[in-house]
């Protein structure tokens, strides 16, 4: 499977949640927010627990372009699914603004070979199957802030590295 069509612009969203509420948010998110975002033009291909941080939820959302990102986010966040469930989702969160806006260093994000663990790393191991760097374009949807204290580089790999973070896919994560 390739995600090339949707990897032109990538958000790595890292939420800090109130203690003990991660699974509550994941259940709500997977039930109410995946299909509406996909219908709006976003592609959600990674939804993760972070075993070392039980009150964090990380996820990846891709877009064809910055303009497509703007349109998809306007459609979703001003639409019925978010309006119906935003309070419930926001009640689980302490912080949802730790967001990296990224672009591919090399096109061709493909599903890695099957394995039991997936890592996000801040220094590229030789086994990296996807590499991204800060997207320098202005944020086209300022209602959702993105970090501007970069630049950042992010790699995904199947093997651990000293600077990596183990990610555990949720039931609906396409990256496994």
Which residues fall in each region the model found?
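Short, low-complexity N-terminal intrinsically disordered segments enriched in polar/charged residues
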Residues: 1-5, 112-115
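Surface-exposed beta-loop interaction hotspot
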Residues: 91-124
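Short, structured motif recognition centered on aromatic/hydrophobic residues
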Residues: 9-13, 25, 37, 57-63, ...
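An amphipathic, aromatic/His-enriched active-site/gating alpha helix that lines ligand/cofactor pockets
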Residues: 2-5, 28-49, 53, 62-100, ...
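Short, surface-exposed ligand-recognition loops at beta-strand->loop->(often short) alpha-helix junctions
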Residues: 17-26, 123-127
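An N-terminal domain-start capping segment
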Residues: 2-21
